[in-house]
């Protein structure tokens, strides 16, 4: 729908100047080596929210979060899920109650056609990163 995985890998490498970390073995050292100041999960799907909320580290994204959190460093979540106001709502609540999780401000993307769908305002990622690095959730969080 949004392009091939290979296209996005190349694009990320262009932007960052290094290849993306997309294997569990590549992200495991994030925590022990303190490789990141902040980890941004964007977009964060309902499936990923559930895994984070239940501490399931079975792929590179969730393993990166687990590894990064061991040092008490911030994880910034940019929600993008069709069931944010239904099934995924509980998982958002769990993460809000935990230390070191921060959210990019989010709201309903189409209340009439998709009443339970939530989407982060991706334009606010830089500001949300600054807040998270300072230990603060930017407000308003709900748009």
Model-predicted segments: where are they?
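A cross-family phosphate/adenosyl-ligand binding-site feature
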Residues: 1-59, 66-75, 82-143
């Amino acid at each position: 729908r949004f392009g091939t995985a290979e296209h996005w890998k190349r694009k990320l490498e262009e932007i960052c100047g290094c290849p993306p970390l997309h294997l569990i073995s590549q992200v495991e050292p994030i925590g022990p080596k303190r490789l990141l100041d902040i980890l941004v999960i964007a977009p964060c799907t309902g499936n990923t929210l559930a895994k984070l909320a239940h501490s399931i580290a079975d792929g590179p994204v969730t393993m990166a979060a687990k590894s990064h959190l061991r040092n008490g460093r911030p994880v910034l979540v940019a929600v993008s899920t069709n069931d944010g106001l239904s099934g995924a709502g509980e998982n958002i609540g769990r993460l809000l109650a935990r230390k070191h999780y921060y959210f990019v401000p989010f709201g309903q993307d189409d209340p009439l056609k998709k009443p339970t769908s939530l989407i982060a305002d991706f334009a606010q990622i830089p500001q949300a990163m600054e807040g998270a690095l300072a230990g603060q959730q930017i407000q308003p969080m709900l748009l």
